Curated annotation (Swiss-Prot):
<dbReference type="Pfam" id="PF00006">
    <property type="entry name" value="ATP-synt_ab"/>
</dbReference>
<keyword id="KW-0150">Chloroplast</keyword>
<comment type="function">
    <text>Produces ATP from ADP in the presence of a proton gradient across the membrane. The catalytic sites are hosted primarily by the beta subunits.</text>
</comment>
<dbReference type="InterPro" id="IPR000194">
    <property type="entry name" value="ATPase_F1/V1/A1_a/bsu_nucl-bd"/>
</dbReference>
<dbReference type="InterPro" id="IPR004100">
    <property type="entry name" value="ATPase_F1/V1/A1_a/bsu_N"/>
</dbReference>
<keyword id="KW-0793">Thylakoid</keyword>
<keyword id="KW-0066">ATP synthesis</keyword>
<dbReference type="InterPro" id="IPR036121">
    <property type="entry name" value="ATPase_F1/V1/A1_a/bsu_N_sf"/>
</dbReference>
<dbReference type="Pfam" id="PF22919">
    <property type="entry name" value="ATP-synt_VA_C"/>
</dbReference>
<keyword id="KW-0375">Hydrogen ion transport</keyword>
<dbReference type="GO" id="GO:0016887">
    <property type="term" value="F:ATP hydrolysis activity"/>
</dbReference>
<dbReference type="InterPro" id="IPR020003">
    <property type="entry name" value="ATPase_a/bsu_AS"/>
</dbReference>
<keyword id="KW-0472">Membrane</keyword>
<dbReference type="InterPro" id="IPR003593">
    <property type="entry name" value="AAA+_ATPase"/>
</dbReference>
<feature type="binding site">
    <location>
        <begin position="170"/>
        <end position="177"/>
    </location>
    <ligand>
        <name>ATP</name>
    </ligand>
</feature>
<keyword id="KW-0813">Transport</keyword>
<keyword id="KW-0547">Nucleotide-binding</keyword>
Length: 493
């Protein structure tokens, strides 16, 4: 680990290199400096002064281009309202730095690492620059290992890779937020890890809702912030493209500290990775670069790779990333999602149909995929159980049209048995969540992978054919299902 990435003490602004604004085009501005005092690419420069109304101005920008004639072009991280030509610009001499460490837990930050939750300043003793290189090959952990989440449907059918990247697909209201909060809760309890949530181009309302729900479910503990399990970094939809383009790096930098220094397993959520690309496209156009395919920036692959390659497992710890992916116009060949897919190890697809049936988490067992589901990685027992579950559910899906038209009685004996087992499997894939206890009234359940495999093997083998299907709904392991069946039998007697 390169300790030089992290610096003690809050970053201070140097004022030795002072320039003046020569041009402002929306969120992009040009500044002229004296010869020999030019800031470097990616340096943070700060515009200080007063607007015509006499209000103080403090706008941080990031240098993107050196134009010649001692001029630089920079992208603003906040609104440029009130800036005028001739205003002084101060070179900080370094890239943007943000606070890292335990002080970030339970707090909400903007792209600059400033708290925006009105809970007072952050006493950051350690800061880190947001532009860092990916870990060297010698530091990487090459072992393929599963990241156990305690969520049955994920661990069995689309397991996450430790240090991998997972795409989360789902529309509004199907349970993305609840699934995210349960993962944050489980990594803290089972792995002793923490989470960082990067809201990239989020709706402000959604960001606020997430924060309120996290407080309600005790993922964020307002009374004792040090007991919180997550740090939040928001760059909302209404902010300039520069802020939306860099907020993902701010969140990643905070996650890297927990991995490299605290040697923890970290979950990094990015919602939405498409907005990161979209912001980069806006900045690229403002900087005058020639657009590439479908109007995207020519540096799309480089920008995505720069972010994704930093998300990995090292010998010290891991960052496992779950990224919500918006697919524009449902076109999977669009350059933005297509570039994202190249980096993903697994996909978790949420289904509105399952949510409508009341099966939560509403993860689609047939559409969700994982590169980890190979017999030489997960073992023959896990692989064969998962394939058996998928085969049974696929057959049930094929028979649904016949059932709808002719009814169950017209099916063969074998098909009726398949349907009965598939309905049990479908219900057993549901699970009560810790963070949803306030809604369901049922205590949350963490189910180990071994218990998950055992349960589905028993359903597939026919051992539990005599149990009613409602016994499998919203339970943890298979023992709870058999106990629930006994209770149902007593109540109906």
């Amino acid at each position: 680990m390169k300790t030089s990435f992290f610096s003690l003490g809050a970053s201070t602004v140097t004022t030795k290199n002072v320039g003046r604004i020569t041009q402002i085009i929306g969120p992009v501005l040009d500044a002229a400096f004296l010869p020999g005092q030019m800031p470097n690419i990616y340096n943070a420069i700060i515009v200080k002064g007063q607007n015509p109304a006499g209000q103080e101005i403090n706008v941080t920008c990031e240098v993107q281009q050196l134009l010649g004639d001692n001029r630089v072009r920079a992208v603003a991280m906040s609104a440029t309202d009130g800036l005028t030509r001739g205003m002084e610009v101060f070179d900080t001499g370094a890239p943007l730095s943000v606070p890292v460490g335990e002080v970030t837990l339970g707090r909400i930050f903007n792209v600059l690492g400033e708290p925006v939750d009105e809970l007072g300043p952050v006493n950051a003793t350690i800061t880190s620059v947001i532009h860092r290189s990916a870990p060297a090959f010698t530091q990487l952990d090459t072992k393929l290992s599963i990241f156990e989440t305690g969520i049955k449907v994920v661990d069995l059918l689309a397991p996450y890779r430790r240090g991998g990247k997972i795409g989360l697909f789902g529309g509004a209201g199907v349970g993305k937020t609840v699934l995210i909060m349960e993962l944050i809760n489980n990594i803290a309890k089972a792995h002793g890890g923490v989470s960082v949530f990067g809201g990239v181009g989020e709706r402000t309302r959604e960001g606020n809702d997430l924060y309120m729900e996290m407080k309600e479910s005790k993922v964020i503990n307002e009374e004792n912030l040090s007991e919180s399990k997550v740090a939040l970094v928001y760059g909302q939809m209404n902010e300039p493209p520069g802020a939306r383009m860099r907020v993902g790096l701010t969140a990643l930098t905070m996650a890297e500290y927990f991995r490299d220094v605290n040697k923890q397993d970290v979950l990094l959520f990015i919602d939405n990775i498409f907005r990161f690309v979209q912001a980069g496209s806006e900045v690229s156009a403002l900087l005058g670069r020639m657009p590439s395919a479908v109007g995207y920036q020519p540096t799309l692959g480089t920008e995505m790779g720069g972010l994704q390659e930093r998300i990995t497992s090292t010998k010290e710890g891991s960052i496992t990333s779950i990224q919500a992916v918006y697919v524009p116009a449902d076109d999977l060949t669009d350059p933005a999602p297509a570039t994202t897919f190249a980096h993903l190890d697994a996909t978790t697809v949420l289904s509105r149909g399952l949510a409508a049936k009341g099966i939560y988490p509403a993860v689609d067992p047939l559409d969700s995929t994982s590169t980890m589901l190979q017999p030489w990685i997960v073992g023959a027992e896990h692989y064969e159980t998962a394939q058996g579950v998928k085969k049974t559910l696929q057959r049930y899906k094929e028979l649904q049209d016949i059932i709808a038209i002719l009814g169950l009685d017209e099916l063969s004996e074998d098909d009726r048995l398949t349907v009965a087992r598939a309905r049990k499997i479908e219900r057993f894939l549901s699970q009560p969540f810790f963070v949803a206890e306030v809604f369901t009234g049922s205590p949350g359940k963490y189910v180990s992978l071994a218990e998950t495999i055992k349960g589905f093997q028993m359903i597939l083998s026919g051992e539990l054919d005599h149990l009613p299907e409602q016994a499998f709904y919203l339970v943890g392991n298979i023992d709870e299902a058999t106990a629930k069946a006994a209770t149902i039998q007593v109540e109906s007697a």
